Amino acid sequence: MCACGSPARPPLAATTRTPQEQPPAPPLEILPGTPDPKLPTEVTSADGKQVTITDASRILPLTGAISEVVFTLGLGNRVVGRDIAATFPEAAHLPLVTRAHDVSVEGVLSLRPTVILADEETGPPEAMEQLRGSGIPVVIVKPAWSLPEVAPRIKAIAQALGVAEAGERLAGRTEAQVKAARAKAPAGAAKPRVAFLYLRGTAGVYLIGGKGSGADSMIEAAGGVDAGTAMGLTKAFTPITSEALIAARPDVILVMSKGLQSVGGIDGLVRIQGIAQTPAGQRRRVVDVEDGSLLNFGPRTARVLETLVERMHQA
């Protein structure tokens, strides 16, 4: 079975839940104290443009991952809108202005933001140009698809918002938590082969992750082997075929919760051609993680990693 489509990057439970049930997202651990932005700041956006921020009273993050950082820095009371991937409860009351990186210019401008934060995948490009043309400072932040990129992104967002010291503290705390989570992986144990599948059954999207998917970094940090990378997949995502699944030989299948739900839970998953012939399919070893946290690579990443360590190594 194959599919086309481009996934937003996708956290786990060895699962006996029904398709309607989903694992809880890791909670936000907001830094103590409310930082006072020191403005103006001038930063170099990831697209090379120099941006000056003079007012951070109405912040609009256009990705869930950036929203997570802004809220955890203690600036959530300044956020005026959210991306569809900002799934944590603290953001639930905010108006939705993007869907899968598709920005509504009219929706954004109606919120009167004083600074907009986006990443290189936010678009379409003409929408971003319109927002820049409106005079609102737009800062583009590099997306993070691996653990070493987490701290630099936290610091970049904090610097743009005039709270660099809080950014240093949050980055340091996150790095320490990630290190502690990695240390929980069993030493000397056989490493399970884990295949990350990006599933959107209602849209006919069935992809397997490979090198650069983001999931590969998490799987390896949790003491596993990314099955897609091990079988030689050089693209972040490749359409699933039964031959590819059988060749990947996963001991565990990792999915996002809504993706699992979209194919009818584990019962539906093992009916996808090739999955029942894998060790993971035969043993129904499936780990699903809440959609808004696995591939966010932010302050909650250590909690996701702890879940992976716990679930991937279950007998």
Predicted regions and their residues:
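A ligand-binding cleft/hinge motif common to bilobed small-molecule-binding domains
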Residues: 122-133, 252-270
